[in-house]
C-alpha cells in the first residue's frame, strides 16, 4: 500500500538560472528563501556556470520563489531564469546546496 499522492496545490519547480550566479552566495540565498517559504529541494552549481534550482511544495510558494529568483535582488546578477513544472517527488526532504 502506498501513501497518499501529492496534493493538487503542490508542485515541483525546476529553474535554470543563467548569469553571474556562482561564487557569490546565490545558492545560500536561494536556500534561505526556499526554507522561509516552506519548500524542499536543492540549488546546484552546474559546470556551465548556471545554477539549477529544484523546489517543491505549494504551487503558490514555488511561484513566489521563482518571482524572487527573477527579482534582480539576488546575489550576483541573473540574466534569465528558465522554469519548468512537474509533479512533486514525495521522497524529497529539506533544502540543500549542492
UniProtKB/Swiss-Prot annotation:
InterPro entries (alphabetical): Acylphosphatase, Acylphosphatase-like_dom, Acylphosphatase-like_dom_sf, Acylphosphatase_CS
Positions of the Acylphosphatase-like domain: 12-98
Key words, A-Z: Hydrolase
Catalysed transformations (reactions): an acyl phosphate + H2O = a carboxylate + phosphate + H(+)
Pfam families named among the record's database cross-references: Acylphosphatase (PF00708)
EC numbers, comma separated: 3.6.1.7
MF annotations from Gene Ontology: acylphosphatase activity
Domain of life of the organism encoding this protein: Bacteria
Active site residues per record: 27, 45
NCBIfam families the UniProt entry points to: PRK14422.1
Family, as annotated: Belongs to the acylphosphatase family.
Name this protein carries in UniProt: Acylphosphatase
Amino acid at each position: 500500500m502506498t501513501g497518499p499522492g501529492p496534493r493538487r496545490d503542490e508542485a515541483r519547480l525546476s529553474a535554470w538560472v543563467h548569469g553571474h550566479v556562482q561564487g557569490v552566495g546565490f545558492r545560500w540565498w536561494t536556500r534561505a528563501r526556499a526554507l522561509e517559504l516552506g519548500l524542499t529541494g536543492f540549488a546546484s552549481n552546474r559546470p556551465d556556470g548556471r545554477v539549477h534550482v529544484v523546489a517543491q511544495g505549494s504551487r503558490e510558494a514555488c511561484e513566489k520563489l521563482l518571482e524572487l529568483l527573477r527579482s534582480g535582488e539576488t546575489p550576483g546578477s541573473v540574466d534569465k531564469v528558465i522554469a519548468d513544472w512537474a509533479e512533486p517527488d514525495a521522497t524529497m526532504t529539506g533544502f540543500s546546496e549542492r
